[in-house]
Amino acid sequence: MKKIVLTAVLMTGMGAVAQTPAAPPPMAKPGLTLTTPAFDDGGIIPNKYTQAAETGVAVSPKLTWTNVPDGVVSFAIILHDPDTSLNKTTSEVLHWMIFNIPGTARELPEGVPTQAQLPDGSIQALNRGQKVGYMGMGARAPGPYHHYTYELYALDTKLSLGPDATQADVMKAMDGHIVAKGVLEGRFHRP
């Protein structure tokens, strides 16, 4: 009789264990996120940041990033217009390329100075207009809006490149070192 009771108790206990639901999986951490207070992702880029700026000089928008993974040594930002290559036979237009932004940074201010090397060690390369720094958007109207893509790369290294680096040079140097990527897109054509 003792054997039967003990077996029944053990089986009841095992059944309770078998019916205990598994712990839920941990929530996935959101990926690297790039934002700006200047416009919503996918929204219209204000003239201030374009070749249609009232002052005649476009300024770069403030950019902020969150959800940075561990192990980031530096960041790179590439701003380009892929619609140019889709609509014509020319390559996409590079509007801005800045790299070796310190891994501790979480934003760039509005109006980054147009100089090759910034005080924090960041390096700005030549844009499509063959000038250092940010070049505002200039898609002509009438016509469809162009989509301007800001790509933020979190890297596990600094790039051994100077301001004469091309977009191809930067992409090659980043190969195998990209920890995370965030994207922000805006639309524009001249009024």
Describe these PLM feature segments.
Residues I4-G13:
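Sec-dependent N-terminal signal peptides
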Residues M14-A18:
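Sec/Tat signal peptide C-region and signal peptidase I cleavage site
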Residues Q19-P191:
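N-terminus-centered regions that define maturation/targeting leaders and the start
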